[in-house]
A protein has these predicted regions:
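A transmembrane-helix-recognition feature enriched in membrane-embedded lipid enzymes
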Residues: 1-44
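P-loop NTP-binding module
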Residues: 17-21, 33, 43-49, 53, ...
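A broad detector of short, well-ordered amphipathic alpha-helices
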Residues: 21, 59, 63, 123-126
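Walker A (P-loop) phosphate-binding motif
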Residues: 32-97
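Phosphate/Mg2+-binding loops and adjacent switch elements
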Residues: 81-83, 87-194
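Intrinsically disordered, low-complexity segments enriched in glycine and mixed charged residues
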Residues: 196-278
Length: 278
């Protein structure tokens, strides 16, 4: 589905729909506040975004799983299986299942690591752990309230950003930006070439403005904005010194080398993380 043009600008139509977006956003905030998520024994890494549509989540999830395997772990993917008829939990078998069964992206994920399709995310995560997963990588699901996450990465299109800044149906956002980013430990800005750096600078300024003092994402935005824009790209790509993020469920044993490799190897992406700058 093609996104409406008014999602990219604050047109009269978008402004007219804005009250509905506020109601939608408040509903999303209430759901998160009332959530009592289920925790599995393996760490859960969620690759999500704040807007509808693709923003590089699946390639990012693939990169994370590839690096986890390189570190000797047994990652399994977990996804809802949009576009497929199977509710799951079911382990995707590319030799048996089709896109009509599980959707397109699970077939792509299953070529790299075991992939589970489950509309019931806790049940899918439990199935993955029972099948030998020592870490679960969720492709999408940042707004899902039923499964506890140990690490959340928000993938943002560095050029499109958050569109007109309105929540559905007035804009592309699934929830208020500040609400979503308060639950993440890193922002992955996926962009093309150097032309996206100005958009990245705008994103950093937005992050700095919406977060309270002491928030880790605000801290890194503050630090990066002290650099010249030409330096930002180089500094993010060469970010070393990444430390554990204080996650639960044993994730702290996985995440430091994961983030180090993530910064070095994720092609075309810029990782904004508070430990990236000493």
């Amino acid at each position: 589905m093609r996104a409406p043009e008014f999602w990219s600008r604050r047109s009269p139509l978008a402004c007219g729909l804005a009250p509905l977006g506020v109601a939608y956003g408040l509903g999303a905030r209430l759901r998160q506040g009332l959530a009592r998520p289920h925790r599995v024994t393996a760490p859960v890494i969620c690759i999500g975004n704040l807007t509808v549509g693709g923003a590089g989540k699946t390639p990012t999830a693939l990169a994370v799983a590839t690096m986890l395997r390189g570190l000797g772990h047994r990652p399994h993917f977990l996804t809802r299986g949009y576009g497929g008829r199977l509710a799951g939990p079911v382990r995707v078998d590319p030799a048996v299942h089709t896109a009509a069964d599980v959707g397109d992206e699970p077939l792509l994920l299953a070529a790299e690591a075991p992939c589970w399709v489950a509309r019931d995310r806790p049940a899918g995560a439990e199935a993955a752990v029972a099948d030998g997963a020592d870490v679960v990588v969720m492709d999408d699901g940042l707004q899902n309230t039923r499964l506890a996450k140990d690490l959340c990465l928000a993938v943002v299109d560095a050029e499109a950003g958050f569109g007109n800044g309105f929540v559905l149906p007035a804009g592309p956002l699934r929830e208020f930006v500040a609400d979503g980013l308060e639950r993440v430990q890193a922002v992955v800005a996926v962009g093309g070439d150097g032309a996206c750096l100005q958009h990245l600078a705008v994103l950093l300024k937005l992050l700095r403005r919406i977060f309270h003092r002491g928030n880790p994402v605000k801290a890194v935005a503050d630090r990066f904005l002290e650099l010249q824009i030409e330096q930002v790209d180089r500094r993010l790509d060469l970010a070393d010194g990444l430390r554990e993020t204080g996650c639960h469920g044993g994730a702290e044993k996985i995440l430091p080398p994961l983030f180090l490799l993530f910064c070095r190897l994720l092609a075309g992406g810029h990782v904004l993380h508070p430990d990236a700058v000493q």
